Amino acid sequence: MGWLDEAARIEMVDHSSIKKHEPPSSNNINWLDATGEKTSTNELTADFEKHFDGGPASIRVKLHRPMATFSLTVLFGPSGAGKSTTLRCLAGLDRPDRGIIRFGDEIWFDAERNIFLPPQQRNIGYLFQDYALFPHLTVRQNVAYGLRKFSAPLRRQRIEEITSLLEIGGLEHRFPRQLSGGQQQRVALARTLVCRPRLLLLDEPLSALDAPTRHQLRRQLRHWLVQLQISTLLVTHDRSEALAFGDHLALFHAGRVCQNGPVQEVFAAPADVNAARIVGVDTIAQGRIVNISDGLATVEVGQTQLVALAPPAGAAIGSEVYICIHAEGVTLEVGAALPETSARNRLVGRIRAVDREGPIVRLNLDCGFPLKALITNQAYENMGLHEWSDVVALIKATAIHVIMSGPSSREGKIINRSRYGQI
């Protein structure tokens, strides 16, 4: 089945019970579900397993998200970790092998009871990576595709509302080939939203755009979804996108959800070393706790001792741990007379490597263990730094996250199952 067929299956919502009433005279979007009734409180529960032919790869997904009010859940992780297949199973485009998927009081899939609700009966919106616009239809015809069973006045109202909100009103008679990437993205989103889905699934919606357009639409997309109050699941492997979009984050590794929670919390406090690597922690080093006092742990790392917040449970003197430090949590100073700061850790080090990235500079330091720091290009020049410069790295105890060593942390190697396809 091609992407046009899949897009058609998603857009063909079952409108058999829709009331063909005339639209009220209002300029505001009256955000109702596809039946014309107010959207009820919903919870998404997904506990399923999906296997793949040609190898041992599988995904095992456990998600439970309340959807009573607007929330944006990010499915985050490397390519091949299971994110896109999870969306496809939720949408009904792929059928799991075991488990259950429930949304509110509707059962979308139950392997034991042989229940499988087809995509067009789930009232979800799905935005594909390549937008899946119909090339032979105009913008207006693409947007109206899922509204064919509505009355003409209601179709007209819905189209006018969504094209106005997404600022594509002047493009209605153009064909997709005549649009920029950003315009195509807006049209695809309009076609998805005009049917009033109860749940929106976005599969890396900005990945095909150039950087400036992606940055602009990132802010706008979040604003539109908040306005429309549509609970959303978004797939991405872009860290900045996850931080900008999400309220809640489900972290995927090797076909499993290895951690979930508020976005900032997961990025700041990964549960194990695999999670730390996936969220992009810059410095991960092995150490050993040598002292615990007043909620602080002293950790011996290489030839250095660091003071960090003690792990919440299970920590004792002699425990093997990993310390995690984001590069932006490291402040650099030069010179003998250093000002007093609140940073508990003052490490003498030397710059071993310099990596310039436009306005920022990434530095690899040797502070008795490898440490990465991030400063602006202007600060780098003002401080007169260069490779082999001696510096002092200042790190607050709160900027060091300690992970207890265990089987998942010692594993260290991130499994890439991409040879079995995008899962």
Predicted segments with their positions:
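ABC nucleotide-binding domain signature
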Residues: T73-V74, F116-P118, R122-A132, L233
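ABC ATPase nucleotide-binding domains
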Residues: N123-G125, H136-N274
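The feature captures the beta-strand-to-loop junction immediately N-terminal to the Walker
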Residues: F76-P78
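Helix-to-loop junction immediately C-terminal to a conserved catalytic motif
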Residues: A91
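A short, flexible loop at the N-terminus of ABC-type nucleotide-binding domains that lies
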Residues: K38, E43-T69, E112-F116, S151, ...
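Glycine/charge-rich catalytic "coupling/switch" loops of P-loop NTPases
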Residues: I29, A268, Q305-D355, K372-I423
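ABC ATPase nucleotide-binding domain helices that frame the ATP-binding cleft
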Residues: S84-L87, V187
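Conserved ABC transporter NBD signature motif
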Residues: H15, N30, A34, G99-A111
